[in-house]
Amino acid sequence: MRTVTPSKPTNILLVEDNPGDAALISDAFDQVADDVRVHTVSDGAEAMSYLSDHRETGSFPDLLLLDLNVPRVHGLDLLESLQEESELTTLPVIVLTYSEDESDIAESYDRRANAYLTKPNDHDEYVSLARAVDEFWVRTAQLPTAA
């Protein structure tokens, strides 16, 4: 079981193509947690490459924040690909997107997303979201270690 200790930062992989949203998310986590590191990639293909590069060391991120509408490999396709990789099936994925479309929500959960959140409208709401993610996914939830 994965536990977070003060000496080991929590690593979040953020898949986000909008630089403004990426900055807001990273800044929000910086404000709420000293021990959370956000690494940003701008599309689904880059996310798969990042995860593939980390396969040899087994140093996968602790959490993946995923915008659905990213270029090259759509977020839903990325979710499906994660389930095809045995080492990645336990990686917690939170979809963080502007879409409130019922089919996007249903398809995300069908493809094993752990949560579906709609992006906030302002900085303070991003900070509240980061605090909630940190408190639940980083500090409270008991998660399996990567295979």
For every predicted segment, state its role:
Residues 71, 101:
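The feature encodes the CheY-like receiver
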Residues 40-63:
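Acidic, metal-coordinating helix/loop segments flanking the phosphotransfer/catalytic sites
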Residues 59-62, 87-92:
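His-Asp phosphorelay/catalytic-motif detector in bacterial-type signaling
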Residues 17, 96-100, 120:
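Conserved active-site segment of CheY-like receiver
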